[in-house]
Every structure is written in structure tokens, then in C-alpha cells.
Amino acid sequence: MNTLFMHCRPGFEGEVCSEIADHAARLDVAGYAKARPDTACAEFICTEADGAERLMNGQRFDKLIFPRQWARGLFLELPETDRISVILAQLAAFPICGSLWLEVVDTNDGKELSNFCKKFEAPLRKALTQAGKLVDDPRKPRLLLTFKSGREVFLGLADADNSAMWPMGIPRLKFPREAPSRSTLKLEEAWHHFIPRDQWDERLSGDMTSVDLGAAPGGWTYQLVRRGMLVTAIDNGPMAESLMDTGLVQHLMADGFTYKPRQPVDWMVCDIVEKPARNAALLETWLGEGLCREAVVNLKLPMKQRYAEVRRLLDRIEEGFQARGVRVSIGCKQLYHDREEVTCHLRRLDVAKAARK
């Protein structure tokens, strides 16, 4: 099981290869990354038998930027009939697993396999259980089968607490009909990814204050209002009347890059389409000057060298806070609802909750 298989957004296979190669070098795991364009997946082939396992053990999945999901394992060719017997025979060398996910890659060809997976899962689950290879235990490894076609599957393992929280890393979020734009799902997914669910009541509470830079028409403001927060929406464009009618939103027609609140707030969010370095500077200013405690900001990506640019900006942000003597946690992820962008989450670790006026 010397292959690490990773899902990603189509078109970002090269970024996954660059990123995982960086981490492999850091962990002294020998191997090479490979991918074909627009296949929504990439592989890292380890030269040592335990390389993929060491790579996964040495790297937290939630700290990766571009991979949506990962698993270590091997590819298996399948016959037209009796696929289950072939899979069971190969799984003899695998440990007992605590859960089972059947996955496909995020391409048109992959989506066409979804119905096959739905029909195949029940008999496979039954056979695995009867063979003693599958039990209901979240502490045991997760068995991930990624079907490239009806005749080829990647048999993979991943720890349930060190892999994606959704199959293929694709969240099942429902677009709220009352939200003014689909961008609302980006902020909701960001909260799921960066904030443990059992901390939402504390860190996304209704007694908090927030600022949404570049807010109009209010897709991200909607998420803040839904949590009961007071929101200052900064944008020269119009806000959705439904949000203004809540009484929780103050709309200021101002420049999001120059506005600063009179009093510190709990949250700042920003989805302004601008050069990534300029949006990154907002994070340094707002967190560094104590204007907010937590922030979610999207960084639009260049056409080339996208991983290198993101890495450069994150390093600059981290160095800036170190120079200020400010303690922060920094997270970055290309979310499912992101396109040519990544989402950054920063949290100050040394300031108290803002007082609501």
C-alpha cells in the first residue's frame, strides 16, 4: 500500500502534487507525485512500502490546502462479474475497518458512476461484515473505495479523524432559499471545516458582533445573521432588503479596504474579488491590530504557480504576526464551494471576546 490517492477540484491536480511533495520532503518520505490534468485526482507513489502510512501519520489532513480527500492503498482491476470476491481477496491483507465509504472523482465520468456505487454498496457492506473485515467502530481505519470505472477501483485506508469529514470531501449543504446569493455556502462550509461543530455555540454565538467587507448583496451576511450576530455590512452596492429587515444589519457605503470599526468585533469576513496579496493584508491588519478575534477571508488565485503563491502569502502572514508578537492560528483550504480561490481562517489566541454594544 505505497500509493497515496487524493481527490481535488478539477484543474488543481498540479497544486496537489506540489503540496504533497513538499510535505513528503519535510517528512523524509521518498517518492514522486503524478496526475493527469482535469481528472480531479492525484497520486503520490512512495518508494518504500510504509511511505504512504508515514506521510499520513506525519501530516494532519485538515492542514492540507488543495486535497479534498486522501487514502493510502492500491489500485485493483475488477472483472465484469463477481467484483466482490476479487475485492474481498485483496482486502485479506487489510486491517479490520470501522466504516466504509464508496467514492468517485469529481468529473462527469465520475458522477456517472454514482448510481453504480449506490447499488453496489449494500451487497459489498454485507459481504465485508460477514467476512469480519467491517465493524461499526470510528476508532478503526475507514475503508475508502474510489471507483475510476466499473472495472478499476482504488482500495484505500484513512483514519476517520485524519481525513475528510464528507465522502470525497464534498459537503452536503442545502442552499437556503432566503439567502441572497449562492456565495453563502462558502462561509457555511468554512465554518464546518475550520470550527469544530461542538464549538459553534461558543464561537458563533448570537451575542457577537461582526463586519462583512464587500458584503453586497449579502450572501455571507446572511450566515452571520442566521447565527444571530449584529453585522456591519461594508459595500457601496445594495444589500438584500430581507437582511436589512432583520434589524441586525447596519449597511455602510464605504471602501472595504480602508474601513475600520470604532470598537473591536468578534468576526470579520471578506469575499472581495481582489489581488490575493491585498486581501491577505486585510488579515494582517484586522487580526494584528486587534480589530477582530476571528476572520474568514477568500484569496483569489493567479493563473499559474497557485500553490507557490498561496504558500508565499501564508508565510508572509505568519511572519508578520510573529514580528508583532501576536499569537494566531492560521488555516487555509480550497473548499468545495471555492473556485479559483482558497479560504483562509485566522483566530487570535490572546484576546477576549468583544463586548456587544
Curated annotation (Swiss-Prot):
UniProt subunit comment: Monomer.
InterPro entries in alphabetical order: RlmM_FDX, RlmM_THUMP-like, RNA_MeTrfase_FtsJ_dom, rRNA_MeTrfase_M, SAM-dependent_MTases_sf
Statement: the UniProt record of this protein carries the keyword Transport: no
This protein's name: Ribosomal RNA large subunit methyltransferase M
Known role: Catalyzes the 2'-O-methylation at nucleotide C2498 in 23S rRNA.
Cellular localisation: Cytoplasm
Catalytic activity entry: cytidine(2498) in 23S rRNA + S-adenosyl-L-methionine = 2'-O-methylcytidine(2498) in 23S rRNA + S-adenosyl-L-homocysteine + H(+)
PANTHER family: RIBOSOMAL RNA LARGE SUBUNIT METHYLTRANSFERASE M (PTHR37524), RIBOSOMAL RNA METHYLTRANSFERASE FTSJ DOMAIN-CONTAINING PROTEIN (PTHR37524:SF2)
SS bond partners: none
Location of the active site: 300 (proton acceptor)
Gene Ontology CC entries for this record: cytoplasm
Family as reported in the entry's similarity comment: Belongs to the class I-like SAM-binding methyltransferase superfamily. RNA methyltransferase RlmE family. RlmM subfamily.
GO biological process entries: methylation; rRNA processing
Entry coiled-coil feature ranges: none
GO molecular function: S-adenosylmethionine-dependent methyltransferase activity
Enzyme class: transferase
Protein EC: 2.1.1.186
Record keywords, A-Z: Cytoplasm, Methyltransferase, rRNA processing, S-adenosyl-L-methionine, Transferase
Binding residue positions for S-adenosyl-L-methionine: 183, 216-219, 235, 255, 271
Keyword hit for Methyltransferase: yes
